[in-house]
């Protein structure tokens, strides 16, 4: 009996008709696709995008070269070199983030004791030449300077959850 039902199912191509029915059913349902350059999904308030280094209001950079972000990075994307200044404080001389390695987990932002490194809401960026994937300290500071008001507003809104 089992062979007979298998023969009729294969003769009538029921699997093929089932697949065609499924395709026909989804043809008339609303689409969930977003046409990306013209339309965009709303971003989460906690979206983690391109990194930035912040400064204090007096213009001094916040990073104290504690290297916690470098130590906590699971992808080993952060490289920091530091040196002592004349006044005895330690500051970074090199702060590089390899965006090809970075997994945007946010551990660097959470581990920073002075809120120096933050992840912005910049989603769209590109590289034209080899080596542009490594973002250095002046570039990170420029991003932070440009977006400081937005970063401060977002961190103030999220302060209750930290």
UniProtKB/Swiss-Prot annotation:
Note on cofactor: Binds 2 [4Fe-4S] clusters per subunit.
InterPro entries assigned: 4Fe4S_Fe-S-bd (IPR017896), 4Fe4S_Fe_S_CS (IPR017900), NADH_quinone_OxRdtase_chainI (IPR010226)
Subcellular localization: Cell inner membrane
Broad enzyme group: translocase
Cofactor(s) needed for function: [4Fe-4S] cluster
Record keyword NAD present: yes
Domain 4Fe-4S ferredoxin-type: 53-83, 93-122
Keyword Metal-binding: yes
Keyword annotations of the record: 4Fe-4S, Cell inner membrane, Cell membrane, Iron, Iron-sulfur, Membrane, Metal-binding, NAD, Quinone, Repeat, Translocase, Ubiquinone
Top-level lineage group: Bacteria
Gene Ontology MF terms: 4 iron, 4 sulfur cluster binding; iron ion binding; NADH:ubiquinone reductase (non-electrogenic) activity; quinone binding
Binding-site positions, [4Fe-4S] cluster 1: 63, 66, 69, 112
Broad class of where this protein is predominantly found: membrane
SUPFAM superfamilies assigned to the protein according to its UniProt record, in alphabetical order: 4Fe-4S ferredoxins
Binding site for [4Fe-4S] cluster 2: 73, 102, 105, 108
NCBIfam families: NuoI, PRK05888.1-4, PRK05888.1-5
Assembly, per entry: NDH-1 is composed of 14 different subunits. Subunits NuoA, H, J, K, L, M, N constitute the membrane sector of the complex.
Primary role: NDH-1 shuttles electrons from NADH, via FMN and iron-sulfur (Fe-S) centers, to quinones in the respiratory chain. The immediate electron acceptor for the enzyme in this species is believed to be ubiquinone. Couples the redox reaction to proton translocation (for every two electrons transferred, four hydrogen ions are translocated across the cytoplasmic membrane), and thus conserves the redox energy in a proton gradient.
Family: Belongs to the complex I 23 kDa subunit family.
Protein name: NADH-quinone oxidoreductase subunit I
Lineage start: Bacteria, Pseudomonadati, Pseudomonadota, Gammaproteobacteria, Lysobacterales
């Amino acid at each position: 009996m089992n062979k007979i039902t298998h023969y009729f199912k294969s003769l009538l191509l029921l699997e093929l008709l089932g697949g065609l029915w499924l395709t026909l059913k989804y043809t008339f349902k609303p689409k969930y696709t977003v046409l990306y350059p013209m339309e965009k999904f709303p971003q989460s308030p906690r979206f983690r995008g391109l990194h930035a280094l912040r400064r204090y209001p007096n213009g001094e950079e916040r990073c104290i070269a504690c290297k916690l972000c470098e130590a906590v990075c699971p992808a080993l994307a952060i490289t920091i070199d530091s040196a002592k200044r004349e006044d005895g404080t330690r500051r970074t001389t090199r702060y590089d983030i390899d965006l090809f390695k970075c997994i945007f987990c946010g551990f660097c932002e959470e581990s920073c004791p002075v809120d120096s490194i933050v992840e912005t809401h910049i989603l769209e960026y590109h590289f034209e030449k080899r080596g542009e994937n490594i973002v250095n300290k002046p570039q990170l500071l420029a991003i932070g300077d440009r977006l400081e008001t937005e970063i401060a507003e977002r961190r103030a809104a999220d302060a209750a959850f930290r």
